[in-house]
Swiss-Prot record:
Keywords: Bacterial flagellum biogenesis, Periplasm, Signal. It comes from Aquifex aeolicus (strain VF5). Involved in the assembly process of the P-ring formation. It may associate with FlgF on the rod constituting a structure essential for the P-ring assembly or may act as a modulator protein for the P-ring assembly. Pfam families: ChapFlgA (PF13144). The lineage of its organism: Bacteria, Pseudomonadati, Aquificota, Aquificia, Aquificales. Gene3D superfamilies: 2.30.30.760. This is Flagella basal body P-ring formation protein FlgA. One of its GO terms (cellular component) is periplasmic space. The keyword Signal applies. Belongs to the FlgA family. PANTHER family: FLAGELLA BASAL BODY P-RING FORMATION PROTEIN FLGA (PTHR36307:SF1). It is found in: Periplasm. InterPro entries: Flag_basal_body_FlgA_C (IPR017585), Flagellar_FlgA (IPR039246), SAF (IPR013974). It comes from the Bacteria.
Amino acid sequence: MSSTPREYRRRMKCSLKRLIYAVNFLFFLFTFSLDLESLIKNELRKEFGEEVRLKNYKVLTGIPDNFSKVELKVYKNSPRGFLHLKNTKVGTIALELEWKCRVLVAKRDIYPGERLNFSNVEEREIYLERCPQNFKENFVNFVALKEIKKGTIVRRSYLKKEFLVKRGEIVNAVYENGNVVIRFRTKALENGYYGEVIRVLSPFSRKVIRGKIIGEGTVKILR
């Protein structure tokens, strides 16, 4: 049986009302989501500045109306955290985070046994869930244990520490006095890493002198 014009108009009005309600509800959710995301980012910025950024979040419990207290529970370098919104009830939001990390990145493929230097690695700031262990000393003291592909973050586990100068080796020496620069070859009497002072044998007087390691197989003679 066909509908009368009046019934048809009534059904259309009901459908339109449901559509308007659905659109308004979706708009409310979208607006609420934007406001909540802004709140989370603002709280993170107040606590950590630009050190951390929000990757994702999930509302675990209902958000109370007119909450009066905001409590951030985040530990530095942790990929997870929580934001609590408190009134008479507590709303909890789970956070997924990324931290600003200063890392070494391979500028080109690095092969096993190759020493790190400014030609094959560079420092960059990137965001990661956890920052890898920082180098507590100059990276030129390390050589690759395995092949490290271009663009890869160079982790401490990929490397081994190795002397830049080894006892008994013939090394390059530099002596500076004002504008006078003398370069010669001499024998290392000790092992050493970058920046360390070791004993070397003078080829001129055959006396023991001291030199500071400034590169692989290179020392600067101290006065």
